[in-house]
């Protein structure tokens, strides 16, 4: 398992000799390291992350030492690496790839979809996601998915141990849960509205705070959630103005989009209140009391213009989605 904090990389792979003329190349998904999780979110704004570079080279080397057929597979980020690495091989290697399995794996950056390499292998890919999938619907994909009946809900279904099996096959369903569909719409609209540059700054800032606290794994946060959240906000308010503003603005936009998508799906004939999110200076009020922090924040005219710009882009995207769903 190759973890490089400087490069923001977490990568692992293994090769199995399945039959005399067939090999399986398996890419590991994200482990519990914070570096690995940060690298995952880099895929929202970058068309190439360090683990993908390693995956391309690993698959190339395995193909060079073996003349038979290849199958490529992976769970979560490993599934992304499987498809991405296959798409970036020479055509001669791609012709030897029989199947690509993506198990609840995020898609790819939108810039990859139109490449010749991706188009040559996409028909060989199989995609499986649980009924309440979150990770498996992230980013873009042209691979149809199979929905697996699963236990638990939300992110807990990401573990394949939660997927239901009957005899020698997965139990398949016809539809995703409503929560999965809404989360998918939210994340895709959010990453479409926010520029790649702002997404990079947002995630760099978000993870920087946890690294400064000495967090090494997501389990550190999970088992000490309350303590780390308090430290997170303390450090956030001590950051320079630009970083603090991007963290609040882009994060707030995510929640606003989620709320509005949920509101638009309601079929009941009751009046639903409009969510009006506060401006930055209203959002960050002074906290008082034991174990609390006191902060002040002044929003500049430029920051407010940027905030309104993103709100306008979101409204335009929402209108385009409605028009596409209900053409005249």
Describe the residue ranges of each PLM region:
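Short glycine-enriched nucleophile-adjacent loop
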Residues: 82-91
């Amino acid at each position: 398992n190759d973890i490089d904090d400087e490069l923001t990389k977490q990568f692992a792979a293994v090769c199995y000799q399945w039959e005399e003329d067939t090999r399986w190349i398996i890419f590991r998904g994200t482990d519990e390291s914070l570096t690995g999780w940060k690298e995952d979110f880099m895929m929202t704004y970058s068309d190439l992350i360090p683990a993908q570079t390693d995956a391309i080279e690993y698959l190339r080397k395995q193909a060079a030492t073996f003349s038979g057929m290849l199958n490529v597979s992976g769970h979560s980020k490993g599934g992304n690496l499987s498809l991405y690495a296959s798409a970036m091989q020479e055509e001669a290697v791609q012709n030897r790839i029989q199947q690509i399995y993506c198990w609840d794996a995020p898609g790819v950056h939108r810039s990859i979809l139109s490449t010749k390499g991706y188009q040559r292998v996409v028909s060989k890919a199989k995609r499986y996601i649980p009924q309440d999938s979150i990770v498996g619907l992230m980013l873009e994909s042209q691979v149809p998915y199979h929905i697996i009946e699963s236990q638990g809900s939300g992110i807990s279904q990401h573990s394949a141990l939660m997927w239901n099996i009957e005899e020698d096959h997965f139990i398949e369903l016809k539809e995703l849960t409503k929560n999965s569909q809404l989360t998918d719409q939210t994340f895709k609209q959010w990453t479409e509205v926010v520029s790649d540059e702002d997404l990079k700054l947002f995630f760099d800032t978000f993870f920087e705070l946890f690294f400064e606290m000495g967090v090494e794994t997501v389990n550190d946060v999970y088992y000490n959630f309350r303590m780390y959240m308090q430290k997170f906000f303390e450090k956030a308010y001590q950051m320079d103005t630009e970083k603090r503003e991007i963290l609040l603005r882009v994060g707030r936009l995510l929640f606003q989009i989620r709320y509005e998508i949920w509101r638009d799906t309601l079929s009941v004939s009751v009046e639903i209140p409009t969510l009006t999110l506060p401006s930055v200076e209203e959002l960050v009020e002074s906290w008082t009391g034991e174990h609390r922090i006191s902060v002040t924040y002044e929003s500049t005219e430029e920051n407010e213009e940027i905030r309104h710009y993103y709100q306008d882009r979101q409204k335009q995207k929402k209108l385009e989605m409605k028009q596409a769903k209900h053409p005249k």
